[in-house]
């Protein structure tokens, strides 16, 4: 059985111990259920930059890649690029992750550029965001500019590309290791190429580099008859644990994982299957534990606009997508904050996401957060929490599917590995 307790320091109080295994079992299927009940299964230990365990933290801090959570002081970050953003072909996995009012858009423009004027404005917004990050003392890295309109073909499928806008989707930093995710969309099969020059440089300078097993993305990975006509259909299917991705082979987006020191929280979604989560669990054990949490969400794809851990014992929980295990966090002494309703207008295009990008924020440290300049309600929420807001307008960038957390991958945060749950 999986035991969880929160180690809380300072004014946050004493330890609290809670058992969660029985509450998670219903989320598991088949052998995945049995495997997750044991924390002693086969594991691959994380290797520090220096072999001597006594200097582990020091060695990790000397690596160019080092990040254990979502809130330690940010020193270096990758920011995505909107350049050449291409509409993905309207395949079954894209349909399962988008809202029906945009389906005609995908049917008409799949394989073509997103609206050029919109992308141009998004580029300007992200450039301004980079300037602000640099002003705040953060080193900013960017992926390569690539032509995503080129058609490619594998033995199993053919597609055009999409973009390198959301590094959070493809890269996950755990300690001194950078992990390339085996994403589930065919249009994102070669997205890693935009980041390889950066990753190779980090590797040469001492970081650990892992590429998860690349999926074939054969037809068997997808339920070709996934019965979606409306969001209500998806809600019912997700509630029954039915998703467009099957368990044919491991797949996951890095953005379906949320880090809190030694504990990492993941969700089964339309792009992340149990095999993918199991691969991560084995790969990161025994130094890290991966826990599955679930939500009342008709369109689960990425955890960070649903459940965003912004500090030790502090989490934003989407009121429209309540976490089924939220009482575990409350009983452990965590502060659960419900963010206000987003202010983004109904007529603003959001081709790949919901309005809840308002809570998809980037923590620069425990007391500074980068947040959308237009979301005045959430500014007030952070002020009440004693967190200063750094306001940047990225509304046009939002349309491409992400907020500040999505548009970034924190490469280096100044901190050490700690336990917040055990």
UniProtKB/Swiss-Prot annotation:
Keywords: Membrane, Mitochondrion, Mitochondrion inner membrane, Transferase, Transit peptide. It is found in: Mitochondrion inner membrane. It catalyses: L-arginine + glycine = guanidinoacetate + L-ornithine. Its main location: mitochondrion. One of its GO terms (cellular component) is mitochondrial intermembrane space. Ubiquitously expressed in adult tissues, with highest levels in muscle and intermediate levels in eye, heart, liver, stomach and testis. In stage 28 embryos, expression is higher in the dorsal and ventral parts of the trunk than in the head. In middle gastrulae, expression is highest around the yolk plug, while in stage 15 and tailbud stage embryos, expression is largely restricted to the region around the presumptive notochord and gut. The active site is at residues 253, 302, 406. Residues 1-37 form a transit peptide. InterPro entries: AmidinoTrfase (IPR033195). Its EC number is 2.1.4.1. It is an enzyme of class 2 (transferase). GO terms for biological process: creatine biosynthetic process. Pathway: Amine and polyamine biosynthesis; creatine biosynthesis; creatine from L-arginine and glycine: step 1/2. GO terms for molecular function: glycine amidinotransferase activity. Catalyzes the biosynthesis of guanidinoacetate, the immediate precursor of creatine. Creatine plays a vital role in energy metabolism in muscle tissues. May play a role in embryonic and central nervous system development. Belongs to the amidinotransferase family. PANTHER family: GLYCINE AMIDINOTRANSFERASE, MITOCHONDRIAL. Homodimer. This is Glycine amidinotransferase, mitochondrial.
């Amino acid at each position: 059985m999986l035991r969880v307790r929160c180690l809380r320091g300072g004014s946050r109080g004493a330890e609290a111990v809670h058992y969660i295994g029985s509450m998670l079992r219903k989320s598991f299927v088949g052998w995945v259920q049995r495997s997750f009940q044991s924390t002693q299964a086969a594991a691959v230990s994380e290797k520090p930059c220096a072999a001597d365990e006594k200097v582990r933290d020091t060695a990790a801090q000397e690596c160019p890649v080092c990040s254990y959570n979502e809130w330690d002081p940010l020193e270096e970050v990758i920011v995505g690029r909107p350049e050449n953003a291409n509409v993905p072909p309207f395949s079954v996995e894209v349909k399962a992750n988008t809202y029906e009012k945009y389906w005609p858009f995908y049917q008409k423009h799949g394989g073509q550029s997103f609206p050029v004027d919109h992308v141009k404005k998004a580029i300007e917004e992200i450039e301004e965001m980079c300037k602000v990050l640099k002003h705040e003392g953060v080193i900013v890295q960017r992926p390569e500019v690539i032509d995503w309109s080129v058609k490619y073909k594998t033995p199993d499928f053919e597609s055009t590309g999409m973009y390198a806008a959301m590094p959070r989707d493809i890269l996950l930093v755990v300690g001194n290791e950078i992990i390339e995710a085996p994403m589930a969309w065919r249009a994102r099969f070669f997205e890693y190429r935009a980041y390889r020059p950066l990753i190779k440089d980090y590797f040469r300078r001492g970081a650990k580099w892992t590429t998860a097993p690349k999926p074939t993305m054969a037809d068997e990975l997808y339920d070709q008859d996934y019965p979606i006509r409306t969001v209500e259909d998806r809600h019912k299917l997700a509630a029954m644990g039915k998703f467009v991705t099957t368990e044919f082979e491991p797949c996951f987006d890095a953005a379906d994982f949320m880090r809190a020191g030694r504990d990492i929280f993941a969700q089964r979604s339309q792009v992340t299957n149990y095999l993918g989560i199991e691969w991560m669990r084995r790969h990161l054990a025994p130094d890290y534990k991966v826990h599955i949490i679930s939500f009342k969400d008709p369109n689960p794809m990425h955890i960070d606009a649903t459940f965003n851990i912004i500090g030790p014992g502090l989490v934003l929980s989407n009121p429209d997508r309540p976490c089924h295990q939220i009482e575990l966090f409350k009983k452990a002494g965590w502060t659960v904050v419900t963010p206000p309703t987003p202010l983004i207008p109904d007529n603003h295009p959001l081709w790949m996401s919901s309005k809840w990008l308002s809570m998809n924020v980037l923590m620069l440290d425990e007391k500074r957060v980068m947040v959308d300049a237009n979301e005045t309600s959430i500014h007030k929420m952070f002020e009440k929490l004693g967190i200063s807001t750094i306001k940047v307008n990225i509304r046009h960038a939002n349309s491409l599917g992400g907020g500040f957390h999505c548009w970034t991958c924190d490469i280096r945060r100044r901190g050490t590995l700690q336990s917040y749950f055990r």
